[in-house]
Amino acid sequence: MKWYKNEQLLNYAKKADEALDKKDPNSLYEISEKLEKLSTDYVESKMMYAYYLYISFTSLNNYIDIKVNNKETVEWEKLIEKSLFLARTAINSMDEYLKDTEIDEIEYIYLNGIYNSVKTNYCNLLISIGKYSSAIFEMRKLATSQFGMAIGNLGTEIFDYACFDYTDNKESLYKYAYQLLDTALTYEDSIVHPNAKAFYQSKIDILDEIDNFNPYDTEYNVESILKKDRLDNYNFTNNITNEDYWDWVAENSLALNTINDIDYMAKNNQDTLHLPNILTSINNHSSFYGIFNQIKQEYCSARYILYEGMYNNKNHFSDENVYLVNTIDYPKYGLNIERVKAAYRSAYALFDRIGYFLNKYFKLGLKDREVSFKKIWQSANNEIYEVFENNIALKGMYWTYKDLFAKTKSKNLDCIDKKLRRTYTIRNIMEHRYLKVLDSNFIDQATSDYDNLAYTITSDELNELGINLIRICRELIILLCFTVNINENNINKDEKDKFVTMALREFSDEWKI
């Protein structure tokens, strides 16, 4: 019997829908718990396993929405961790099933419906913990398939994102949000639920109140933005040019510019993001801008070095006459692979740089030699947690810490982002042990059997992890800016007239060497 015809599963799905209609949190929680337990009998049958987890995930999500009012408790955090586990495990199981199984058109329709639903709700979950760029990145991929709910939810995410944005992109983000929401309203009720449409319309109504607001006065329309990305079929090999670099940056959403979260078209002036106004003493007026300059420069340099290492296949003169032994396992050596590693290390170092910034900005009191991105969250009495309630951007940084260092309240490490945790593992091996990169072009012949000292990884996986690491750093940098802006607005909202603004001019490109 096909998994999508399983009567037991269909019956549980019906019960979950009925419990939601009745707003019965106890039944939703019981269904979620029961199906999570039942799913363990089907781990080898990937779609049955995913289907059980899908119903468990949606039931638990609905339970949280109905039952849990206080989002600053350990109980809420444990429930979110469990939801993340159910969603991520279901998505991974479906991805593996699609990779290993040939399916017919009917099965694809059923699978695609479940996959889109899980991914959409997963992105909504990321929004609830402050990881806006991550959520938008994943939701945008769904929206390019013209899935109506994803288009509408992407619109709400961009709307919320714009509310936090203090840069010149704010109005453009609102316009793109409007277009997405308006597009979602054109779908039939069977595709976009009437309740969802009402919610989308409420956002549109808010935007319609803005004076002189023309939502369709944008450089690109939503239809062109949601086309399949060009990078899928683009070959950058031996083509290291300014134009190609910025194409790569834009289409991987790596620019320090909030518009790049929705708009993947390459532009000039990509990296325009900087800190907002900060209240500080006149004798210390530029310190935070100075450290942010350093964070930003290191990010942009690491990003380019990664690109160059990935796409420059030319031999470099510095590799000539460097005698190496052929170990018969197809390793990769040379300046380009070392560029990728260097970019990886440099990007990873930004976590601690950001931790140093937060320690000084929030006056957490950690000694300079003890500060790290990990340690600023570890003290139970740490003042940084007092800021959480009114600063969702800071909460997004906290959840990145949880994924990176496998820190959970429930002690269930299966809820963490496996790719980010893998990023952490590879960095530690690269830094403290012995990482051997095997050539993905010869993956069938490559083997680690001949080298029991090495921890091996393919060049393709290292590149993929490198891009993901850069993207996570980008999100943290944006969240850092939002965190500061939210905090400055909270502490200054009643006393703005008492302060004098001091202008800081741009550091010219001509001065950079």
Predicted segments, located by residue:
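Long, charged low-complexity segments
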Residues: 243-279, 381-447
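Structural signature of alpha-solenoid helical repeat scaffolds
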Residues: 4, 44, 75, 103-106, ...
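Helix-turn-helix repeat elements of alpha-solenoid scaffolds
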Residues: 20-40, 73-101, 126-139, 171-181
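Amphipathic, Lys/Arg-enriched alpha-helical patches that create a basic surface
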Residues: 420-426, 444-513
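Short non-catalytic regulatory patches outside canonical folded cores
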Residues: 325-423, 432-433
